[in-house]
Structure formats: C-alpha cells, structure tokens
C-alpha cells in the first residue's frame, strides 16, 4: 500500500464507514459523566455551508470527539430550524412548497457535514417544520397559556389556582392588581372571565402597536428590529395596531437578570441582555389632567420641582383624549408623521427635536402649578409609561426641546453645598450630574443619593406617587402573518377564545400550493376555509387563529427535544433531560444575544416553574465564533459579493483534515479573521509531515547515555503536549491546540534518529491519538494501516504523567513597589524562601532598593516576587 499522503484515497471511505457503523450514535442516560455539546439550530439555506460556517462546527466536533475519548457519554446532535421567512420567501420565488425546499437544503447540509467529518448523531435529527416537532411547540404554548406569574412566590403557577383564589377571595391578596371581589368574579360571564384572566396569562392576546415589515408583510418582535429596519429584509419598519399573541417574558425580567451570574457566558453577551432588559429603579409620579391622572416614571424624583412641561409619546392614548379642538389637526398630522420613523431614529442622539403643543395642561402638584403638555417623538411608548415630566435644567433632551420651543428652564440641583446655583438663562447644556437640591421646598440642601429615597418616600406618604421599577424589556410578540410557521393552537367562538386540547395536537399546517402573504395584514391561512373553520366537541363552530408563531418559538426548546427526539407521548422524557441538561457547551453567533438566547432562558424558567424541568438555565457555557472574512480582510463572505468559499472546493484541493485544522489554527476562536489560502497550505504540509513520521520507519540509534537523555527530553515533551492539548481543547483554545501539535510533530521529526524505539513509539502513539479529534480521517487511516483495532475514535485519550509534564524552570516577575523591574528564570522546584532570597539578591531588585531595607516581600508562587520598600 502506498504511503503517499493523499486524502482523496481515504476520506470518503471513512465517512461512509462511520455512517454505516453509526459510530457516533449517542446512548441513553447512564452512569457515565455526560457532555452535551450543541451548535445553534441552523436554518438550512440553499447556498449550503461556507468555510465561515465551518468555523462554528469544526471546534465543537473536536470537543465532542475529545470527550468521547475521555469516556464521556457525549450528545452532539443536529437539526434544522426550518420554519420562517427565508424558507417561505425562497419557496415563493421558486414556486414550490417550503417543505420540499427544506428537505433539499438539509440533505445538502448533511452531505457537507459528512464531507468535513462532523460527528453528529444523525439518529436524533430534528426538523422544526415536522408535525412531530411542532406539536410540542404548540404544547408549550398551551402550558404558558394555562399559567400565570405569581409574584408572591416568584414563579409561574397554573391559572386554575388563580381562578380558585378569585372565586374565594377576589384579588384582595394579589399585589398590584385592581380590586375585584369574589362576588364580582363569580357573577362574571365566561367571556368576561377570559378577558380578565388575559391580564395574567403567560401567553395572551392583546391589541398592540407592532413593528410591521412592509417587505416581509408581517409583524416583527422588538428584538427583530435592528436600527429601525427588519432584521432580514432591511426594510424600514412601520408601526401598526393589530391583535397579537404575546408571551409575558417581562414577568421573568428580574430572574433573567439575576441568573446571569449562574452561567459561563462571554461578558459582552451578558451585558447585551442586561441592557436589553434595562432594569431601572425610580418613582412613578401622578400628574392630574382633565382626562385623568397621567403617570410618569422617573429615575430622578429629586428633580420633580424642575418639571416645567410634560411630553407624551405620539402613541400615548392621552394624546387623543387631551388634544383640544384648536390643536387637534396639528396634533394628528404630527402623530401620523412620527409613526413613519423608527424608535431608533426618534431617539438618535443629536437629532433635532420636534413636537407640538396639544392644548392641554397637567398639574405639577409639588408646587400646584399647571404645566403644558406636548407630544414629541423623542419620547417612546416602549419605555416607561410613554410620558415624561420634562426637566430641561437636568435632562439634555428636555433642555434641547425647551430651548427650541421657548419653554421655561428651572434649576433645582446645584453641584454641591458650596456651589453657586446655575443661571437658567445662561445655561448652554443641562446639568445632569448629582448634587444638592435647591428651590425644592422641604428638601432644599438634600444631596442626590439621599434625596431620591426621601422624595420617593414622601410621594408615597402624600399619595402623589410610589416607588417603582421599570424595564426596557417588552413582552415577546409571537404572531406572524405568514404561512410557514407553527399554527397557534387557539380557536375563536362567539363566546371568545378556546385553547385546543392537548389531545388534539398538532394543529397541522395545511399542505397548499398558494400561500403568498396578503396585503391586508391577514395571514394567508385566513384564506384557507378548510383550515379556518372547525367544529368543537360541543357542536360549536369556530374559526382557528390564522397567525403562526415566529420561528424563535421553535428554537426556544429544541435543545430539550434532542434528548428524546422520537418520543410520541411527551415533548421530552424527564429522566433524559435531567441527565443531559443543561447544555455543557453552546456555540453560535453573538447576533442572537437578545433574541434566541433570551427567549430560550425564559421558556426554560417557565417550564421549570411548572414542574417540567429540574434546572433553571439551558446553556451552562456559551462561546461565540469569530467571523471568517473575505481574503481582503474587509468584507464578509456573501453570495451577493461573489466571495463565498465553500468547504466542497477546499476539500477537493486540500482535503477535509487540512480544512479542519486550518479553521482552528487561523486565529483565536472568537476573533474575526480573513481567509488565507497560504495558511491552508501550511496546515496541509504539517499533516503530510505527521503522516510521514507516523507511517515511515526510521533508523533508531544504539541505546547509550546520549539516547537516554534524548528519550527523557522526548518523554517530557510528549507529556507536556498531552497536558497542553487537553487543557486547550477544554478551554476552547483551538489555535494553540494546533500550534502545540505542530511543535510536537517537529520535535518528533528532529528527534526520530536520536531516541529509542520505545520512546519514539510512546510519542507517536500520543500524537496519533491527539490527532484523532482534529484530523479524524487521517488518524483513522493511520490507525488502520498500523493494524490496530477499529476505531481510533473509540480509543482512550492519552494520559499524562504530572511529574513529566511539570515545568523544570519558571520565570518569576520581579517587582519593586508594584512596578516590574525585571524577570528571573529559576528551577521550578525552588522553595518560597529560596525564591525570595534569589529575588532580593538579583541586580534588578537591588538597583531599585537604593540601600533601603524591604518592609515586606510578597511571593505569588510560580509567578512573581514584589518587594515593598
């Protein structure tokens, strides 16, 4: 058999063999330690995989192979996030059904995954558009529909418990709810009760101003609007009022924030979630108007005495109620124009302020003065109450607005006790810092941190307001006016909404040839009579909800289904999820930080509260891959720019193992980097050298003293490499995994004629086993040619000897008073006393002591000595 390095001779052979033998099939829950390694649920596009996608999948495959060799029970599955706009739009363009496209596209993805040696367990393959899957998405919807969040116990409870409590006690013991007696509840008609319970359900329907994508002709969730544009179409989003279904994610805001401390995620992802949830503490203050009390939220109640006007969001219901006849025309025109702009545009820093007076006034009760009410688009309905008290002296946006429209500025905070108060007429910008209250009645002289608490308490005592917490987070809107999605399991009758019985799931998506989006805002399903019209068990004729769920509903629980994908009796087996979850390593793009990652955490917590899951967080460890850029390093790879490189063309020229190792070697995993063919050639050369060392016999020297020393050196290198590669795989440092293996290969090459057969065999055996996760095809072929028992991927990972892997020398940083003054290399086994003594005698330290006696010598073992004088 030729020993020439030619990947085409064996890569396809082993891919077929592994698949035939189901080598990577995952066993059930058992006594072994587990490792659940998961990639983000991909949508299988018609373009197939690019080398950029491989940057995600190769490292998780290496990790999976490594843990299998470590004796772990590894779950490394794959499936398809098949519902949604991309598949539907592509199918409309090609005049076919989306299901056919998904089958075609996913088959190509599977071919490419096999081509590059990804060890998925295909027995667990999922497709979110299959009824066997979305039946359970609908079941979870019903779990949320039949639940409410009880703040007294800080968890979700069955809605039936709330109904029982209302029948006994009304709302008397439920905090923050309008008074309702048991008698009033018991006298309500069924429809009235349903409407009342909608205020509590975790899945509910409500009229809402929504984000409308005019290109996709559907509603978008807040998280799907990026800088005012649809996240897929790029179209400027419009505002519409529609009846929509929502999940009450806001009930979990505090827990979503607090539990970030439980998980090992990149700090920037945690920060994005914190900012998106946007928790802020302050006060809710009431201002009296002719249409009733107008509530505002402020984080600075200490500036209440400086409020000189009020501003309403164009969407605020009080705009229509309060606008006087003399001003109504200009108000209506302004509101219409404002709704054409996205929230991002409206709140952009530096944008010129616009607004109109609505002809009405509110009373600032702290000084019993009427102040004018304006409508302006810089106030957003999605934050706070959609109304603000404008304090131009201490808020920059309010200051700019006041200066433009000639509104009064009243200074109520000065910089400090001895500071001179600002002159409102001379101010060029608002004073937004902390300070001391002035012209604020009984609170004059109170400093800001204390004042905020004192004023809030005073508002509560006097009935003017109360302490409040506000969130930027809004409930998750799931309704989509498109065909290709999970049907919402609700039927409408003359008496109101009726949830579909779990026994009648799934509500199947009809197989139709025409499903183009409508211009009316209705879902295409509304035009399919056989889907819409349904007879209920009691003989009532109803009509189905025709909106479908947004695709993020499907991806909010797929990690649970992978543990038990063929279960026809339940969404998942409780024993299996208890064993496998949470996911140990989750890998995908940072762009999903405030969509999929937030939604999945919410669903997990809700299902935990309802007794279905024994854990609170779905993904224990998260990593985001860096982007592969075009070779020029400036552009993303994209089909439109014609710069996409596919794994197919790379494997054809260089082989799958060269592609895999280059994907890892190219840079740190989380760093964006350009594609470089020269680097690919380098990994190819390295693999060829490793191949030759592993398969070509070399002459060994006659053992002598020189050989013994060479053996000791090689053994140390071998065990150090095993330790380093093991630690770096687990630490997701794949570039240093490859560089360590390259260095070890070169060391083997240089030492092969100077070491004994025993030492060389130990080293090459270790190299081959360490190559198995990163270059699985070559490793399997070499293993086979050595006539070893199939398969190398079922062998044990090499162990290292701690003594041999230990460093013989260390480099200590030498500091004097915390400043680095030098470095010193010394034996690793030096004691602390010896290290201190050597450091004090070194020229670098003595020079900076300048004759002074050290006060203290701080020793950090193996790292530094700091001399304090």
Residue ranges of predicted features:
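Conserved oxyanion/phosphate-binding beta-strand-loop segments in alpha/beta enzyme cores
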Residues: 1-38, 68-77, 100-107, 265, ...
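Basic, alpha-helical terminal appendages of large translation-related enzymes
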Residues: 1-34, 313, 325-328, 388, ...
């Amino acid at each position: 058999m030729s020993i020439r390095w030619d990947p085409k001779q064996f890569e396809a052979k082993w891919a077929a063999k592994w698949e035939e033998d189901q080598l990577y099939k995952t066993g059930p829950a058992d006594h072994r330690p587990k490792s659940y390694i998961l990639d983000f649920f991909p949508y299988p596009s018609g373009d197939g995989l690019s080398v950029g996608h491989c940057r995600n999948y190769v490292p998780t495959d290496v990790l999976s192979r490594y843990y299998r060799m470590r004796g772990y029970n590894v779950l490394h599955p794959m499936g398809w996030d098949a519902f949604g706009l991309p598949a539907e739009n592509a199918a409309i363009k090609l005049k076919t059904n989306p299901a056919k496209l998904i089958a075609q596209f996913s088959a190509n993805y599977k071919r490419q995954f096999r081509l590059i040696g990804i060890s998925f367990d295909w027995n667990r393959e999922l497709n979110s558009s299959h009824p066997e899957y979305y039946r359970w998405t609908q079941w979870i919807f019903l779990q949320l529909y039949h639940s409410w969040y009880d703040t007294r116990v800080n968890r979700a409870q069955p809605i039936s418990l709330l109904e029982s409590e209302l029948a006994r006690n009304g709302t008397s013991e439920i905090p923050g709810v309008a008074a309702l007696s048991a008698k009033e509840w018991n006298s309500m008609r069924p429809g009235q009760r349903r409407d009342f319970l909608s205020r509590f359900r975790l899945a509910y329907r409500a009229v809402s101003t929504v984000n409308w994508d005019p290109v996709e002709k559907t509603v978008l969730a807040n998280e799907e609007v990026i800088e005012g544009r649809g996240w897929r179409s790029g179209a400027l989003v419009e505002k519409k009022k529609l009846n929509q279904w929502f999940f009450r994610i806001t009930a979990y805001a505090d827990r979503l924030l607090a539990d970030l401390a439980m998980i090992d995620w990149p700090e920037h992802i945690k920060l994005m979630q914190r900012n998106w949830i946007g928790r802020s503490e302050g006060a809710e203050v009431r201002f009296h108007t002719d249409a009733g009390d107008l509530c505002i939220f402020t984080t600075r109640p200490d500036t209440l005495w400086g409020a000189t006007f009020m501003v309403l969001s164009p969407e605020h219901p009080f705009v229509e109620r309060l606008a006087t006849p003399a001003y109504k025309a200009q108000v209506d025109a302004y509101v219409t124009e404002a709704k054409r702009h996205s929230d991002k545009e409206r709140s952009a820093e530096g944008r010129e302020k616009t607004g109109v007076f609505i002809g009405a006034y509110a009373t600032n009760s702290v000084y019993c003065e009427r102040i004018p009410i304006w409508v302006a688009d810089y106030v957003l309905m999605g934050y706070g109450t959609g109304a603000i008290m404008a304090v131009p002296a201490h808020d920059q946006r309010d200051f700019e607005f006041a200066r433009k429209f000639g509104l009064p500025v009243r200074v109520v905070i000065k910089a400090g006790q001895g500071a001179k108060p600002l002159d409102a007429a001379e101010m060029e910008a608002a004073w937004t810092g902390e300070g001391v209250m002035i012209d604020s009645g009984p609170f004059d002289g109170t400093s800001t941190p204390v004042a905020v608490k004192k004023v809030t308490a005073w508002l509560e005592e006097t009935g003017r307001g109360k302490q409040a917490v506000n969130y930027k987070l809004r409930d998750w809107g799931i309704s989509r006016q498109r065909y290709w999605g999970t049907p919402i399991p609700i039927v409408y009758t003359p008496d109101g909404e009726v949830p579909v019985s779990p026994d009648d799931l799934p509500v199947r998506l009809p197989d139709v040839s025409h499903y183009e989006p409508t211009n009316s805002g209705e879902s295409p399903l509304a035009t399919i009579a056989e889907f819409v019209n349904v007879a209920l068990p009691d003989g009532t004729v109803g009509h189905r909800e025709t909106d479908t769920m947004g695709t993020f509903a499907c991806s909010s629980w797929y990690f649970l289904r992978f543990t038990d994908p063929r279960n026809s009796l339940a969404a998942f087996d409780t024993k299996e999820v208890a064993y496998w979850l949470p996911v140990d390593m989750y890998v995908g793009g940072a762009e999903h930080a405030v969509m999929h990652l937030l939604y999945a955490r919410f669903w997990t917590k809700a299902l935990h509260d309802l007794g279905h899951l024994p854990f609170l967080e779905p993904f224990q460890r998260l990593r985001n891959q860096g982007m592969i850029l075009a070779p020029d390093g400036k552009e993303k790879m994209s089909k439109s720019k014609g710069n996409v490189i596919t794994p197919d063309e790379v494997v054809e020229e260089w082989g799958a193992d060269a592609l895999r190792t280059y994907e890892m070697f190219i840079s740190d995993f989380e760093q964006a980097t350009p594609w470089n063919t020269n680097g690919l050639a380098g990994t190819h050369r390295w693999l060829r050298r490793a191949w030759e060392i592993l398969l070509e016999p070399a002459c060994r020297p006659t053992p002598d003293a020189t050989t013994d020393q060479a053996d000791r050196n090689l053994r140390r290198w071998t065990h150090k490499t095993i330790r380093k590669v093991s630690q770096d795989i687990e630490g997701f440092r794949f570039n240093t995994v490859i560089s360590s293996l390259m260095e070890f290969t070169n060391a083997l090459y240089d030492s092969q004629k100077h070491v004994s057969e025993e030492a060389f065999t130990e080293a090459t055996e270790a190299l081959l086993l360490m190559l198995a996760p990163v270059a699985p095809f070559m490793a399997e072929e070499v293993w086979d040619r050595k006539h070893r028992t199939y398969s190398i991927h079922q062998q044990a990972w090499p162990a290292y000897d701690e003594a041999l892997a230990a460093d013989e020398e260390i480099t200590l940083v030498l500091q004097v008073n915390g400043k680095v003054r030098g470095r010193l290399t010394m034996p690793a086994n030096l004691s602390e006393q010896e290290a201190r003594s050597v450091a004090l005698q070194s020229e670098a330290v003595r020079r900076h002591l300048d004759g002074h006696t050290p006060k203290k010598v701080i020793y950090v073992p193996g790292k530094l000595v700091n001399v304090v004088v």
